Regions:
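SAM-dependent methyltransferase catalytic region
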Residues: 1-96, 102, 124-128
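C-terminal substrate-recognition regions of SAM-dependent nucleic acid methyltransferases
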Residues: 23-24, 103-273, 280-332, 336-353
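Short secondary-structure boundary/capping segments
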Residues: 81-84, 113-114, 366
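Conserved beta-strand scaffold positions in the cores of enzyme catalytic domains, especially
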Residues: 96-97, 320
Length: 367
């Protein structure tokens, strides 16, 4: 398929994740640099992606371009601009010729969340837009059945992101010293370490002073905890006074069908730090328990894997997970165990035996 020269160029381009370029009159091949050495604002935990700029530049230089680069944008994930992601996924001249979820198989001892891909862009050919990318034909087939039946109703519509809960001006009025104790620019954020940073505003036990208190679910020294805080110090998020399912905002590494780390139902009057995101704003605990069963099931987590290719969990990751009716009027019998619920969902969406086997063998069972 490739000439000797092409194979040599491909081997060289894959030799290092730091970047290499090869151009010929007919085709440009490259392994562009992936990110800046220094992160955003000096934040060493974040590095700004730049490979998208090199991809744009390569397309201007040649009609035919073959590149190896991080694959996150194929799932509309990562830190490349969302508009750029959508443009790439809508480009009929772009095709994916190789995908590897485990980057260390391509670049030894190098972890690139979301894997790496080799893409081929040819301005003279129409491959059809990628649209929604998955590396599994079986999952593509399942998506083709599920998406029309969703009628635009996804679990993402009732998901609440991990950044929803914030401090109010009332807290800063009563505790003016707090701003100086928190990171610059984050005086209103409930960061994962906020309970340890400003312990004076939290209480292990509910004070008996007659004030209205809520609980904040967070972590202290790697242990999950509930701490009381005056309700006026926290903004009124849509599910604060409702039942919901909390789950970690980061779980696993983005592999197909991996378990979610200890999701659980929370009642009214419980919010969270940025360690957790949530699903639902339910009137009853039974609805929340049904939603928890759904999330634990293999069907829902298989579809979550379409967009969850890193550890991060955001509402958008649930875009291809169908929203269900979690009330007693549902077409699903939620009294069944999780495996029985999955069987009902397979039938509801008309999955074939092969598609069911794919889910059952690729998605891990949760307790």
């Amino acid at each position: 398929m490739y000439s000797t020269e092409s194979r040599q160029l491909n081997r060289a381009a894959r030799s290092s994740p730091r970047g290499a370029y090869f151009f010929s009159p007919c085709i440009a091949r490259a392994n562009p640099p992936y990110q800046e050495e220094v992160g955003d604002g000096g934040n060493k935990t974040y590095a700004t992606p730049i490979y998208n700029k090199f991809i744009e530049g390569a397309y201007k230089l040649s009609d035919k371009v073959e590149l190896i680069h991080p694959a996150r944008f194929l799932f509309n994930a990562g830190s490349t601009p969302k508009q750029w992601n959508r443009e790439m996924l809508s480009d009929p001249h772009l095709s994916v010729v190789f995908y590897e979820a485990s980057s260390s198989r391509v670049f030894i001892n190098t972890e690139i969340k979301g894997g790496v891909a080799v893409t081929y862009h040819d301005r003279t050919k129409d491959f059809g837009a990628i649209g929604t990318f998955t590396p599994y034909p079986e999952l593509n087939a399942i998506l083709r059945k599920v998406r029309p039946a969703m009628d635009g109703k996804a679990l993402s519509s009732i998901a609440v992101n991990s950044y929803s809960y914030h401090f109010t001006d009332a807290l800063h009025r009563d505790y003016p010293e707090v701003e100086g104790m928190l990171s610059k620019g984050h005086a209103y954020d409930l960061k994962s370490n906020v309970i340890e940073k400003i312990p004076q505003v939290f209480h292990k036990e509910k004070p008996g002073d007659g004030e209205d208190y809520i609980q904040i679910y967070g972590r202290v020294q790697n242990a999950r905890v509930f701490m009381y805080i005056k309700s006026e110090y926290i903004n009124n998020v849509v599910n604060l006074r409702k039942y919901k399912v909390f789950l970690p905002a980061a779980s696993g590494n983005g592999g197909l069908g991996e378990e979610l780390a200890s999701p659980l139902v929370m009642g009214p009057g419980v919010g969270s730090t940025e360690t957790f995101c949530s699903i639902g704003a339910f009137d009853t605990e039974a609805e929340a328990q049904n939603a928890l069963k759904y999330i634990k099931g293999k069907f829902a987590r298989a579809l979550l894997s379409v967009l969850k290719v890193t550890q991060h969990i955001t509402p958008e990751k649930f875009t291809y997970v169908p929203l269900q009716d979690f009330t007693p009027a549902s077409d699903i019998d939620w009294s069944q165990p999780v495996a029985g619920i999955d069987r009902q969902l397979y039938a509801k969406y008309g999955l074939s035996d092969e598609e069911i086997t794919f889910i059952e063998t690729h998605v891990k069972e949760m307790e």
